[in-house]
Curated annotation (Swiss-Prot):
Sequence similarity: Belongs to the dCTP deaminase family.
Pathway: Pyrimidine metabolism; dUMP biosynthesis; dUMP from dCTP (dUTP route): step 1/2
Function as written in the Swiss-Prot or TrEMBL entry: Catalyzes the deamination of dCTP to dUTP.
Gene Ontology MF term list: dCTP deaminase activity; nucleotide binding
BP-aspect Gene Ontology terms: dUMP biosynthetic process; dUTP biosynthetic process
Keyword Heme annotated: no
Broad class of enzyme this protein falls into: hydrolase
EC number: 3.5.4.13
Protein's name according to its UniProt entry: dCTP deaminase
Amino acid sequence: MAILSDKWIRDKALNEGMIEPFVENQRRDGCISYGLSSYGYDARVAPEFKIFTNVDSAVVDPKDFASNSFVDRETDVCVIPPNSFALARTVEYFRVPRDVLVICLGKSTYARCGIIVNVTPLEPGWEGHVTLEFSNTTPLPAKIYANEGACQFLFLQGNEPCEVSYADRAGKYMGQRGVTLPRL
C-alpha cells in the first residue's frame, strides 16, 4: 500500500472531483493551516456544530442515540465544554476512488491543546462530507475555529481495486451531507 503524493491528490481533485472545494496551496497565515500538503490534504471544519450536553441525564447509546443530547450551533468559533465533545463536518466533500483508503489524523495545533479529532477511515467508493468528532480532554473550555484546518487526510492506494466498495454495499453513511449522527 503506497501513500499518495500532492501531485496525485491535485490531479484527482481537479480532474475527478475527489475533493470539493479544493485548496491547491496550503494556507497558514494567521489561521490553522489547511489545503494540499506534500502527502495529504488538510481539511477545514465547517461552521456547523453539534455540542454535546447532558441536561436530560441521558445514557449514550450508539444503537439508540438521542439527538437531543446535542445543542446545534452555526458559528465561526465553537466552544466545547470541559471534558466534553462536539460533532462537526468538513467544508470539503470527498469522493474516494475504488482503489484508495483514506486515513485521517488530527492537527498537532489542536492536539497540543488537548483537543483530539477522531474520524474513521474513508472507505473505497465512499463519498460525502466527513463528520468530525472533537474531544476536549481538558478541564477548561476549548475553542474550535470554523473554516480553518481541522485534520489531515492521507491517501493510501491498495495493490488493486477492492472487490466490494462502500458504494457497492450501499453503506449507511454514503452521500452524507452536514453533520451526521450515528445510524444503524
